[in-house]
Amino acid sequence: MIFQSFILDNLVFLCMKIINSIVVVGLYYGFLTTFSIGPSYLFLLRARLVEEGTEKKISATTGFITGQLIMFISIYYAPLHLALGRPHIITVIALPYLLFQFFGNNHKNFLNYGYKNPNSIRNFSIQRIFFHNLIFQLLNPFFLPSSILIRLVNIYLFRCNNKFIFLISSFIGWIIGHTFFMKWIEFILVRIQQTNSIKSNVRIQSNKYIMSEFRNSMLKIFLVFLFITCLYYLGRVPPPFFSKKLSEIQETHEIYKKGKKIDVEKNLQRVQTKQKQKRSNNKEGFLSLFSKNENNLYKIDEEKYKLGFVKKPLVNILFNYKRWNRPFRYIKNNRFENVVKNEISEFFFHTCQSDGKERISFMYPPNLSTFHKMMETKFYLFTKDKISYDELSNYWSYTNEEKRNKLSNEFVNRAKVMDKELISLDILENRIRLSNDETKTKYLTKIYDPFLNGRFRGQIENVFSTSIQYEKNEKKNTILINKIHGILISNNTYKKNNSNYPELEKKINIFDRKSLVTTFFFFNLISKFSKKLVSSLSFETLSLFPEHEQVKINYEEEKKQIIKILFDAIRTDLNEKTIVNGNRTKCIRINEIRKKVPRWSYKFIDELEQLEGKNEAENYQIRSRKAKRVVILTNKSKFFKKYDTYNPTGDTDNAEKKKNELALIRYSQQSDFRRDIIKGSIRAQRRKTVTWKFFQKRVHSPLFLDKIEKPLFFSFDSFKSMKIFFMFKIWMRKKEEFEISSYTEERAKESSKKEEEKKKENEERKRIEIAEAWDSIIFAQVIRGILLITQSILRKYILLPSLIITKNIARILFFQFPEWSEDFRDWKREMYIKCTYNGVQLSEREFPKKWLTDGIQIKILFPFRLKPWHKSKLRSNEKKKDLMKKKNFCFLTVWGMEVDLPFSGSPQKNRFSSFFDPIFKELKKKTKQFQFFTFRVLKVLSEKLKLFLTILIEKAKRISKSIIESILKSILKSILSLTKIKQFFKLLFIKFKFKKIDELSENKKDSTIYKNNPMISETTISIQSINSVNCSLKKKKIKDLNAKRKAVIKKIEKIKKGLVISETNIHSNKTTYDSKRVEFEKKKLQILQRRRNARLTRKSHSFFKFFMKRIYRDIFLYISCIPRINIQLFLELTKKFLNKSIYDNEANAERIYKTNQSIIRFISILHKYFHTRNPNSHNSCDISFLSQAYVFFNLLHTRIININIYKLRSVFQYHGIFFFLKNEIKDSFFGAQGIFHYKLKHNNPLNSVRNQWTNWLKDHYYQYDLSKSRWSRLVPQKWRNRITEYRIAQNKDLTKCNSYEKSQLILYKEQQVNALKKKIRKQYRYDLLSYNFINYADKKDSYIYGYRSLFQVKKNQVISSNYNTYKKELFDIIDNLFIKNYISEDAILDMEKNLYRKYFDWMGINREILNRSISNPEFWFFSKFVIFYDAYRGNSQVIPIKLLFFSSNVNQNVSENKKNITRKKKNESLELELETRNRAKAEYPDQRNLESSISNQEKDIENDYVGSDSEKNSKGIKKKKDKNKMEAELNFLLRNFLILHLNWNNFLGQRIFNNVKVYCLLIRLKNLREITIASIQRGELGLDIMMIQNQKNLILLGLRKKKNNKFMKKEIFVIEPVRLSRKNNKQFFMYQTIGLSLIQKNKRKIYHKYPEKIHVNKKNFYKYITRTRDQKITEKKEKDNSDLLVPENILSARRRRELRILICLNPNNINSMHRNTIFYNPNKVQNGFPLLTKKRKYFEKDKKKLMNFKIFLWPKYRLEDLACINRYWFNTHNGSRFSIVRIHMYPRMKIR
């Protein structure tokens, strides 16, 4: 089983090795590249399908494979890659190839003459197929872009070490894949032919030769398809031969100027003769290397400059290979725009020596690599031995050991001298500084001194203005040294022109490697000095490294000669840039040392810069958003001379002649698709973007078209109009019946207004679209401008005169007087003013600039209106009315029409209406008069006809009555024999008949039948007469009949009365049936309404319950979170805060005390509430971040020791440096638990160690004890709720209230001194911190200069966890924590003189507010009060409480009397006044002056606060005062928190724009009176806005109306919040994260460490008692614990760090393993720690000696020192690896 598992493991390992090998990976990637099929496969497939013969198919495949092989080789071979990748080379190959292809396919016997055998290799058709496949494979990257699969090869090639094997294997993989692909295609084709899967269902009968023609035309079809693919790719990348040429930057040659040419040849001859005399025969070959030839060194190509241009190669002239083809942006910095490219990338790869080994660095300095390349090319003659890696590593370790020994010996010697008490200043090592003089009295400035460390390195503080002028001290001996100028001679010129070149080849072996290294060191030394006196250079003392002192004497002469050539032979003068020889007076010109740097070939400007006139380039190259330059004013006045003139041509002479212009830029409203792309480059091909409108603001994706409101092809306007018509009809019907309510009327008015606004918006939009359309069309503005001018000429001189002539001729024909003079007077009044494209008028004869390209408008002033007749002169009132109504201007269109606005779609109708309207009016009048006359005539006629007809009717009635009576008499006589009943009915019928006639003829109302019917009476009379004749016969019967007749008549009268009443009611005012129906409906609605109200009243109880639940859930649940607040107390507080004023100083103090007590009492309630809610969250810091310290501290509190800890005994007994475990934690914890050896165990018991741990945690991890405002920005809320924090009680006397800042200009020198002191103290603190870490174990030996162990328990130390512990905020932290005068005077540490401790730091409140974030719930409510709670509690006697809450502008009382300017000055902002006073007081920090000034300040505050009230005591002024207070608070919040960007385009308003247009016209005219009066009368010129006094009137004209929503919709008024960078205190967080190395002491540490603070002068509390070191020693302190000085300060800061790191390094162990390994075997490193295995006795024996070196150990995990370990000290490069973090360090050492 073991053997099988062994075999399986080996097989798996072998398989993994094979899979990960380069060959297999290359085969895999090569196989993948076959799937990247391009257009090169077209020729191959064509040869397989169409060509006949195996030779042609073989030639196609071989050509294809060779082309692919060349492409693979080009990946590895750089020159071939450049040759195939450059566009002009591809163009040279592609153009002849396409021509050859075209002629070869059109001519069958093209270049095949004389060859009869078609299958021979000499046949050109076979060769042509081969070259087709070969060349097109090379042109594949040109026609189609390389696919991802091909690019994978390039990517992996960079990672691979053995590149050539990878390329071969990938090529083989590609061949395998290609063969599989071709076989698969052949298989498919054969399968198709065998199975006949493609069958033609349609038979071709008309033409049998179509298929043969199709086969013959396959070549042409193929060419067309190839041409389409080429065009497709050319659309993506434009070819270089069709690209647009851009103007390049012209190089300025300053050497050759007019009048400054020097006779170069004469100077050359003199210098050459003198140099030849000094040359020695022995060193002739060597010196000739550094001398330049007569012909080529000093000779300048004058012909190049005589021609005026630099000679360029033909390729650069034909092909612009540097241009932008891709849609790249031209990014530039407007402030610092340079010609040189900033192409230094973030990574630069180069081989370097790191840790004694050669490694690839990706952060290598590019300048250094270029210098190495230059030196390698120039020193190719010297033989250079290759150095092995072992030699390099040994050399590196050897140099480090030597440095360490040298530094340690030097330090020990200095320390020994100090032990002998021979203290002198020479013992202390001074800083190395660069000097300019031998006496070392003058040094370089701190900014330019590289040996100085600190804040001066790399920083230049601009304290004063840059206008300080320094005098130039010209010295005779100061020169600029031309560095290594003789070395950098070009090799080609040297070989060609040097006659001594063959002699030099014999002397190549003179120089060996060491001599070359020494020369290089001298070159590096020389390069450090850019300006130096020649006499001060002494190279004998310059030996920076010890190994370079042992140089052979044989090469000293060579070095001297090299230096002599470098310094004495050729030097560059400062002023004239000439070459000066040391002892000569002649001057020679040479070319300086030059390096070809990446330069911008072009300096582009955008279209906006050209329009603004900033640059003087001829044409722009960057296409910006479409815009036009709108010229508002051109004038030669002095006011406009300060503006830059618009000079697109760049001619200064023409620019001076041109008028000064005041112009604006108008942007197009089209969508910007240019996107700052350079001319000639392609656009970015963006997918998923569609534009379906001609004018579209934004590009939309088709995926979201359903979410966008799209205009359809048809609209529903017709349906809307029909709907409106029907609504109007219904409304009219209802109007007849009942009235419309007022609500509906208002709605109708609003809808009509909206419709009008929509119409205006649509018209404006259409107008803009037309204007943009004219801009978008090519040459449209030229055509339009010419048409407008022709239309104006035709109108003025042809059309209008012809109309005048025809009108007057017509008047003559109608026998009226002609009006020639009146018409021509109006014709002459018409003016044609040329305007810009935007409508700004210039003058009648002045054309705008570039009007053919930019466009033109023609405005017609006082347009001619043809009138049929002219009236007499109107009155003045009528004239004013007409002028106000009419607009006496219009714009001319292309069609000759008149328009109110440019590009308006609706033309005016005034041209013909002015002529025909008066005629139509007169016709209307005449028709009205005629109608009135005819109406009167007809009325009279109608009345007369009515009378005539009535008379005729009456006569006819009378005649008819007589005739009827005679007829009746005859009838009665003839019918006497009939019965009585027949006679009765006949008489009754006649009576009814006549009754109806009488009733129709008479129209009287409310009359009886008898009164209205005289015929009845007559008939009765006639009947009575008849009865009287026959009375004797039938008297009784007639009486009976009369009675019956009367009864019937009465019944008829009753029926008639009902009918008459109904008829009269129709014409009366009483209600009809319809009105009754409407009333019934109203009653019905009222009944329903009553039912609904009753239903609501029934359900009101449940509804009220539901409403109360909602209120409780939404409102009162949130209010319940608010703590219990004393409302009465809060109201009293607000009353006192707002209404009380300051009268005297005593009353002020009483008021302040009361209000402070109330505020503190009020806010203490909030504090208690919130602290009692979460008793566990005493503070807002999270100690769980402590990782190691926190975990071990908790383990220490658990008295039960886990068994697993003993398993780590071997790990923790190792006294080396751990990667993830700090030694202090390990020793303190595990030493206490007894894991170490019993002799090495700590003597303290468990409780004392626990106290030490608590102290250690507080001292070392105080950075987690942040303030609430800062912790809230770092830690979330839930972490803060889980915190228990041990706090230390602080003394309130130690507060820092330094609230007075000092001015930089006055105290500049003091700041410099303070900065130096701070720097020294900071450095001293860091050193002491490192000693505290090293000496943590022993109390007695760890006390170094007054510092005790951080683990030492103190009696006065009090640990408390009370949540009411007063915690200091940001402005209470002590800034300058330092040791003051530590040698001569020892004061209480970290304590400063605080003269202003009684006064509150109110100047820093604004900064505090900005950095505070409301994170705790107590800040949700009354945040203004809680902000200053902790700060104001101990300082409540100086400044009024109002000044705390409003640090800005409390009394901005603006007086109504504007004339009283002095009162305004007195009532300025309080903040500025106090700032100036504080600055004055900072200059004189005297106690008496300070107290008096502060009392005066309080009085001034009172006077300012009460100043406005003392004069006017009315109630209105008090209200204004309260409003001003609230405005001050609002302005304070807005100024500090609200920062907005207003993109307000139309901020001036339409009236001001109209005024501007009129001003532009009036400025150009001489006689202004008539036009100004006319414009004022028309209302175009507003006198009220000609002088704008207040800025608010100018800005907020458009905002006065409530139309903000409208502006937001139109995108005119846009509020965009500015993305403000958060103002974080970077240094604070950096120091907090670094933690251990950069401790910034808090005040509570002062209480721990310095119990001497009790000794304070109580009378003068602002002073503290300073005591010297002797006084402290006499005060019962052990003399052994006080060290006079830290011995490490003997060395300088730089040497100190170097010594620490060299001691920590162990080159022997480091060389045994690689630096990048994280895990290693600790058993191999046991030899490096022999002391740890010895006994404690021996350890205690060497304890005193160890103490001397313990302080020099490099502090653990010092990130500052880690950053300093770089190649400058140990040839270690930090760019590639930061492996120095894993340096092994000695915890303890023994002096050997």
Curated annotation (Swiss-Prot):
Q: Which residues form a coiled coil?
A: none
Which regions span the lipid bilayer? 18-38, 64-84, 87-107, 129-149, 165-185, 221-241
Q: Which InterPro entries match?
A: TIC214
GO biological processes: protein transport
What membrane topology does the annotation report for this chain? Multi-pass membrane protein
Q: Which GO terms describe its cellular component?
A: chloroplast inner membrane
Q: Which UniProt keywords apply?
A: Chloroplast, Membrane, Plastid, Plastid inner membrane, Protein transport, Transmembrane, Transmembrane helix, Transport
Pfam families per UniProt = Ycf1 (PF05758)
Where in the cell?
Answer: Plastid, Chloroplast inner membrane
Q: Which residues form the signal peptide?
A: none
Q: What does it do?
A: Involved in protein precursor import into chloroplasts. May be part of an intermediate translocation complex acting as a protein-conducting channel at the inner envelope.
Q: How does it assemble?
A: Part of the Tic complex.
| More about this protein | There is a partial copy of the N-terminus (positions 1-162) of ycf1 in the inverted repeat (ABC25181).
UniProt family annotation: Belongs to the TIC214 family.
Task: State what protein this is by name.
Answer: Protein TIC 214
Protein encoded by which gene? TIC214
